[in-house]
């Protein structure tokens, strides 16, 4: 019996994109923790040339359709991504980069919802220090208390 190892699609898609840019031919490798309970790091990118590694943390979201059609008319995207504010779990230095990942439909008028061709990834790579600043700035409008979510 072979053990089964699973990887969330968000992490797989990000790793696939990184390896398109930083391939094995350039001396880069990706390492994923064998245990999914490993906290603070989802994968490492290692440079054999420089013998250095960078730690990545992936945060993913579903895409949501904007309720207000006027916002689309004003030039805002039709879809938005909502992320949990993980400020209470954030600790500077745990990862060098945070990846915000989401899928959105580029076939807005299509009735087919599950076809691969109708979904595109959005991948934002944010350095650790900037992620801390972003999470600190996520506040409610009235009371200026930390908000539970932020959107892209």
For the regions a protein language model found, what residue spans apply to each?
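Mixed-charge (Asp/Glu-Lys/Arg
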Residues: 1-39, 44-152
């Amino acid at each position: 019996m072979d053990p089964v190892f699973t990887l969330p699609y968000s992490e797989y898609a990000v790793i696939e994109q990184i390896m398109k840019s930083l391939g094995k031919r350039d001396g880069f490798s990706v390492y994923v923790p064998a245990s999914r309970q490993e906290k603070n790091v989802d994968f490492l990118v290692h440079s054999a040339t420089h013998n250095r590694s960078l730690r990545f943390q992936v945060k993913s979201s579903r895409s949501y359709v904007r309720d207000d059609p006027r916002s689309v008319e004003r030039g805002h995207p039709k879809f938005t991504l909502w992320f949990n504010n993980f400020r209470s779990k954030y600790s500077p230095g745990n990862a060098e980069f945070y990846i915000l990942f989401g899928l959105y439909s580029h076939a807005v008028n299509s009735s087919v919802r599950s076809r691969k061709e109708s979904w595109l990834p959005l991948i934002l790579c944010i350095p650790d220090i900037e992620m801390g600043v972003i999470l600190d700035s996520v506040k409610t409008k009235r009371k200026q208390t930390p908000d539970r979510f932020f959107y892209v």
